Amino acid sequence: MSHRLPRGATLMIQGTTSDAGKSTLVTGLCRALHRRGFRVAPFKPQNMALNSAVTPQGGEIGRAQAVQAQACGLPPHTDMNPVLLKPYADQGSQVIIQGHAVGNMDARRYHEFKPTALSAVLESYARLAHQFQAVIVEGAGSPAEINLRTGDIANMGFAEAVDCPVLLVADIDRGGVFAHLVGTLELLSASERERIRGFVINRFRGDMDLLRPGIEWLQRRTGKPVVGVLPHLDGLYLDAEDAVVTKSRPAAPGQDTRLKVIAPRLPRISNHTDFDALRLHPQVDFRFIGTGAPPPPADLVILPGSKSVRADLAWLREAGWEGAIRRHLRYGGKLLGLCGGFQMLGQAIHDPAGLEGPPGSSPGLGLLDFETTLELEKQLRTVSGILILEGATVSGYEIHAGVSSGPALERPACRLERGAEGALSDDGQILGTYVHGLFDEPEALTALLRWAGLPQPRVFDVRLERERGIDRVAAAVEAELNMELIMDLLSGSGRREGHAPAGQP
């Protein structure tokens, strides 16, 4: 049966928990609809994450929405994630509205700000609904968080405001899937329960015949269909929204010697997707090293980006990394600093306005001769140019409040369209840059691996891995979900009728 979608047809995906599979399911649905010839866009009203992406217009959105835009064949846009919260402390976040920071807020102040945030959410959604045939919306966390229900703009508060149907997804791999689904329904209001039109069970591995009695019970108990059961997709690569993947894929038997790369898992690490290309490269053994673990020997040490650079630098020192880095350099190892990690390499970091914590200054590691001052206006841009190493092509994006200056910058790491950027030490052992996504460009990745000591790096393109991941999820969505029901929900014809789940009579 073919479907015609009205402009702005909307379906929302909510989850019983964080990491239930909302982002992945939205990505798969977006690609499936795009393949069917529909003009579709992703939307997440509110996101809390330190992994972000820069749009071509110079705005900031959650990384997951940038991947979902790719699934739709679109460039990312700030309307796809109008509210982004970037935690800089346990009880405070930088609030980004339609791509641009409006200030730091604690939970109480943000609660008071929510009506303004909701206005931005509805404004962005209205623009997407006007431009596209379909909008696939991703919720945040769980809709059943009792303490967050008042003034909710991320889950049912949004669904009720725009009057859209909802599918509820739960992760069976972590256990308790039926309790999660039934319990979530029990904690919703009557109108919210009615809005949930079906369930998706995610990450199933096993015998469907053993699961089927549970599905039948769930449908009888709730009166709602199981729209489908998605399998656990081993080895799937999609950019993580916030969870840090700590190490590389296991090496294949008989594989070449691998370059050893380590990075501290900073408490406020940001944009750790920078490391995905290293984590997935077949010749790289990459590991994040957490609290309490001494830094092991490595060929390359990378200091990641941070949302609280001075606080993370203090943590780095307390964890013994400063001495370990100096020993690493003394024995000929390479050191790379990315964004906040680059700032740590200098002589000092100044935060006179208290943008990332109490106002003040902190001494840097003193490995490069420059200083950084954090300023109110954040630098947001996509960039391209060449890496000084081998003249390799480089592209990526910048997200930082720091402005750096000093003699070390006279020997840059990159030459970008807008000018020289970053720093390379006189002895060539230390490289620092503000460019995120540095390893995503195959030429730059190859040059950096060779610089770090890998004689013959294989060409590797993480962007192709991402595209394959999107296609895998879309194929699973098409094969395992009741797409007829989903299309009915989008077109409006299925809002009040019952439907059989995928694979069910």
From Swiss-Prot:
Keywords: Cobalamin biosynthesis, Glutamine amidotransferase
UniProt keyword Repressor, yes or no: no
GO MF entry, a single one: ABC-type vitamin B12 transporter activity
Domain GATase cobBQ-type: 258-444
Pfam families on file: CbiA (PF01656), GATase_3 (PF07685)
GO biological process: cobalamin biosynthetic process
Pathway per the UniProt entry: Cofactor biosynthesis; adenosylcobalamin biosynthesis
Keyword Transcription regulation: no
Active-site residues (renumbered): 339, 436
Role according to the record: Catalyzes amidations at positions B, D, E, and G on adenosylcobyrinic A,C-diamide. NH(2) groups are provided by glutamine, and one molecule of ATP is hydrogenolyzed for each amidation.
Family, per entry: Belongs to the CobB/CobQ family. CobQ subfamily.
Protein name as annotated: Cobyric acid synthase
Species this chain originates from: Methylococcus capsulatus (strain ATCC 33009 / NCIMB 11132 / Bath)
